[in-house]
Structures are given as structure tokens and as C-alpha cells.
């Protein structure tokens, strides 16, 4: 990852230390080694199948459909779920995994021949991508990391994978490779931290999406779809 340029770092940190009423500590500072770390014990030792069970249970609580399939069945599973959501237009990011998981025929042949519009995110198109996402009925993306505990999919945004794909369409479908499922936020943070340590290019935006958009006021009246899709579904697929 390219290193950025930091300006006025010392002056900024010295000012904070001064306001705290102490001298700035610039040496001998280490990350605390906490004795109690219960976050690592949640679902510790669970198999991928057991984590799928945890994910499935929580999806019921967040009003999200969960479908399980393999690579061969993914084409039909996505087609059928899209039909249950009312069909297209469909918005997708530019992602080679659609081809790798055997979905090219659906996206470039079957749906277009049926009159269903399929729009792929195009970095060169600028704001036109956002307009298409607003018009789309379904947004489809792959989950990078999936949190079983909360039913959350983690999305890495980039120039080819705009956040609007999963935010602006009326409904949303996440394709969840089974290997991406981890117990909770603890493991997701560790994965991202390791990517940084390895020098990988880090996404411009990392989003944690938990089912459809849900909002509630002080009277506990649930309102769905205010800040995102009205409905959501996860398709858990065995890895290739």
C-alpha cells in the first residue's frame, strides 16, 4: 500500500498531550496485552457448517432470507431469488467472481434475453452509476467477510465496486462464499489488519451491512428501507 504524507504530526500530538496536562510519551509505549479477551472465545472451534447455522438463526431475526447452494446451483438460486424480489433492473459491481462462479450466462444472456436490464458498475461512467443504482430493483454483490454472530456481510468498496450497488436499489442480494463466514467482528478486524500488514491495497471504504435497512424511533416503531434496501437475501454458496 502506498504511504501517505503526514503533516504537522508532532505539533498536533504535542498539543493533545498539553491539553491532557502531561508530557507527550513518544517512547516505551506498547499495545496492552489484556489478560481477559472473551471476544476470542465466542463460537471458538465452530466448523464452517456450525457457523452457517449461527448465521441462519440470526438472519431470521434481521428479516433476511438465507439460501444455501453449491456452485452448480448458484445460477438458479440467484435467478429464483431475484424473481421473488420482483425482477430487475439488476445492478452489479465489476467483479471477476461473477464469471468464476458461473453467473456470466445469467447476467449477459438469460436476463437480457428476457428483457431484464443488467447494469455493471463502470468507473469511467461517473455519476451515471449512481443513477442506475437508484433505478435498479436489485443490487447483487459478493461478501468479502461474513459475520455469523450478527448476520453481517462486509463489503470492500473500490473504483470498480461502488457502495451504491448495495445501498440504493430497492432490494439487495449478497452472495456469500462459505469460506468467508467467521464468528464475529473480532475475526473480521484481524483479517483487515493482516491485509494492512501484508501491504495489500486497502479499500477506500469498508461497509458492514446487516440485512435490510431497519430504523426505529423512541417509540420502537420499526421502519424498513429508510437508509437502504427494503429487503435483503444472502445466498451461501460452497466455495469453488
Swiss-Prot record:
Protein name, UniProt field: Lactate utilization protein C
Purpose of the protein: Is involved in L-lactate degradation and allows cells to grow with lactate as the sole carbon source.
Classification of source organism: Bacteria, Bacillati, Bacillota, Bacilli, Bacillales
InterPro entries, per the entry: FTHF_cligase-like_sf, LUD_dom, LutC, NagB/RpiA_transferase-like
One biological process term in Gene Ontology: lactate metabolic process
Gene name tied to this protein: lutC
Organism of provenance: Bacillus licheniformis (strain ATCC 14580 / DSM 13 / JCM 2505 / CCUG 7422 / NBRC 12200 / NCIMB 9375 / NCTC 10341 / NRRL NRS-1264 / Gibson 46)
Family stated for the protein in its record: Belongs to the LutC/YkgG family.
